[in-house]
A protein has these predicted regions:
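Serine-hydrolase catalytic machinery in alpha/beta-hydrolase-like enzymes
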Residues: 39-116, 120-126
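The feature captures the conserved acid-bearing segment of alpha/beta-hydrolase catalytic domains
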Residues: 164-246
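Conserved hydrolase catalytic core segment
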Residues: 147-157
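The conserved beta1-alpha1 loop
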Residues: 46-50, 162, 188
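Gly/Ala-rich beta-loop-alpha elbow adjacent to hydrolase catalytic centers
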Residues: 136-141, 145
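Short beta-strand immediately N-terminal to the catalytic nucleophile in serine-hydrolase-like folds
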Residues: 132-137, 161
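A conserved amphipathic alpha-helix that caps or lines the catalytic cleft of carbohydrate-
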Residues: 64-65, 148-149, 211
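A domain-start/cap signature at the N-terminus of enzymes
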Residues: 1-43, 75
Length: 253
């Protein structure tokens, strides 16, 4: 069994009349992990985030606050710190699209680490073995979450906010694979395609094609939400909207 060590238990966080514990783990196989949890949680949300977000914390707490305002069911959220997004979240190697850093192929290792962590998180926070697990994220973390839906049976729902579906080779992959998750949320800003980058400019076309592919899958519940603004506006709120929709579908199911 995977064991989490070096917990730094923080003061309780009050949110919408609900009290949360905030636990920080300084080291695990990928990096630091921040867990916000209520007593007797019934669902586990997992989200890869940048290291700076773990340190700053304010935006993550605001995201949890938004989810808690909409969902009455108690839950736990594990924010997983990712040091090198281009390496650790990319499903395969690809040349740089912006900046100088090429994309690596570390997504499979990151997925394996997260899957290894799930049983210990459920044990530590008193979640039942069959409690639903939701994976989500923003930008490349959203693409990683979407890719994980195709590669793993570990997740009941995927919240992919502004996923990098322009990623080289992604749609070719999605056309010949089938997602294992039953619920997939997609969203995009309505101005995300307003960019000079010729590859990223295709994102609106790509997200619509991705959504159309998901709509052909039997049983799968999916939606595509359009948010006002470009890629860099309100990421926490957009992630919260995705998790809320996924939780609502699970509760309805």
């Amino acid at each position: 069994m995977y064991v989490i060590e070096e917990k730094d238990e923080q003061s309780p966080v009050d949110s919408n009349g609900r009290r949360w514990r905030c636990d920080e783990y300084s080291e695990w196989e990928v990096g630091p992990c921040l867990v916000l949890h209520e007593p007797e949680p019934r669902a586990l949300l997992v989200q890869p985030v940048e290291q700076e977000e773990i340190i700053e914390r304010k935006g993550l707490i605001e995201e949890v606050d938004a989810i808690a305002a909409a969902i009455d069911v108690p839950f736990a959220v594990a924010f997983i710190s990712i040091a090198d997004w281009n390496q650790q979240l990319s499903p395969w190697q690809a040349p740089a699209v912006f900046g100088k850093a090429d994309f690596g192929a570390g997504a499979r290792e990151t997925l394996q680490h997260i899957e290894n962590l799930l049983p210990e998180l459920k044990r530590r926070y008193d979640l039942s073995a069959d409690a639903p697990v939701l994976l989500g994220g923003y930008s490349l973390a959203a693409l990683f979450s979407l890719w994980s839906a195709y590669e793993s049976h570990s997740f009941h729902a995927i919240a992919a906010a502004s996923p990098s579906v322009w990623f080289p080779g992604w749609l070719d992959y999605a056309k010949v694979h089938h997602p294992q998750a039953d619920i997939i949320y997609l969203s995009l800003g309505d101005r995300e395609d307003k960019t000079r980058n010729p590859i990223m400019r295709t994102v609106s076309i790509c997200i619509q094609e991705q959504h159309a592919l998901l709509q052909t899958e039997p049983i799968l519940k999916t939606t595509l939400a359009w948010n006002p603004g470009n890629h860099f506006q309100h990421p926490e709120q957009r992630c919260a909207k995705g998790f809320i929709w996924c939780m609502e579908q699970l509760l309805l199911g």
